[in-house]
Amino acid sequence: MALPPEQLSAVRQPLERELAAAREVAARAGLGQTEPKILKLAHHTTVHLSPTPIAARICGASIGSDAKLRRELQVARHLASRGAPTVRPASTISAGPYFENGCAITLWEFVSGRPPETAADTMRAAQALQRVHTALQGAPRPLPSFTVAFDSCERILSNPPQSELLDSSDRVFLQTINTELREQLSRRELDLRPLHGDAHLGNVLLTNPGAVWMDLDDVCTGPLEWDVACLPGEAWAEFPGIYRELVQLLNALRRVCVTVWCWADSDRSSETREAAIDHLQQLKTRFASQEST
């Protein structure tokens, strides 16, 4: 579903540059004149190149390296060949990656769907994720470790200009709990396997055939519990054999990462700024309650 126009006024200025780059890439790819309709504003921007059946995924060229984007497309093609419920790279034209006006862009088949809204939707998403995990076996290697997420957080926290709106005391709080949680994780033996890497419900669409997972740029190797930790607790039962204590630990680490990333990107939109504030408050509440027990 495209974002309503009234939400676009709060979006940071570079969005217009991204949309212009998407139009240029669409023309270069042979799609003719298109009108990008915003589907998702996150750390990447996803647009439908209307009226074509193609979507574009856009990020800053400094974020999306050629090698990383090519790996994402390669993994996506592997998943498509296995019949996995995932988005597919454009096949009638070159999927890219393209680099235009400081933006890195890949092209995908457009999927019309809606976000999960009910407990039943969550279960369907979890079951589809199981199929993705099965199809990821034999995915092109090497894949990065899931710990690159933690490294990214540490770099942002140690470089205040990357998250300048974050209060210094809050920065110390996040650095402290990030260090403590990573130390706890280092004491555990982990069974590693290929994962989606960012399996929260914002990265899945419900379509008529079923749930479809997207945003495959964080595919990695890690414990199954890393993907499960992205899901609501009621979905954990769909993954028998997981260690719930490990899921809870990784859920806490993931919340730290999401909080840091939101603060680093808090000028992207009012939604991102609100999410940054909300995630930080949830972490403070969570760790305050742990200290009092």
Q: Predicted regions span which residues?
A:
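Juxta-kinase regulatory segment immediately upstream of eukaryotic protein kinase catalytic domains
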Residues: M1-Q33
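A conserved alpha-helical element in kinase catalytic cores
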Residues: E16-L19, I58-N101, E117-V132
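ATP-binding glycine-rich phosphate-binding loop
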Residues: A29-S50
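A glycine-centered beta->alpha junction motif in the catalytic cores
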Residues: G60-A61, A104-T118, C153-L165, V256-E274
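A cross-family kinase active-site recognition segment
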Residues: S112-D170, L192
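Active-site Asp-x-Gly
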Residues: R193-P194, L206-N251
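Catalytic-loop of the protein kinase fold
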Residues: P194-H196, L201
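Helix-rich C-terminal or lid/interface subdomains of diverse kinases
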Residues: G241-T293
